[in-house]
Amino acid sequence: MTPRLSPRLLRAARALVGWQLDDAARESGVSVALLEAFESEAGVALSPRSAGKVFAAFELAGVVFIAENGGGAGVRLRRPETSIGSDEATLALEELNASNDE
């Protein structure tokens, strides 16, 4: 179940992937002005269509939205299948050592 998009959740998702508002707007097709007003917590709401576009853009970037389930909504990055720009498998942080650290 996807959580309700809140200004705080949107800011967290942007921080996770390093996007500025203009990046989020470009990737989602939702205007910078609307995203900025939404994030300001001034009572501006996103329509279900706009929220869906925002969710889709961030999910494409690897963000996983976590439903509340009693612990609070949140975001995390999906574990990459392979390294960006290569065919090599990505190593988990705990698997890195001096012999495989480039």
Residue spans of the language-model regions?
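Short basic helix-loop element that most often maps to the first helix and adjoining turn
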Residues: L9-D23, S83-I84
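Short alpha-helical DNA-recognition segment
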Residues: W19-A37
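DNA major-groove recognition helix of helix-turn-helix/homeodomain DNA-binding modules
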Residues: G29, P48-I66
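Short, solvent-exposed alpha-helical "recognition" segments
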Residues: E41-P48
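Short, charged recognition helix plus adjacent turn
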Residues: V63-N100
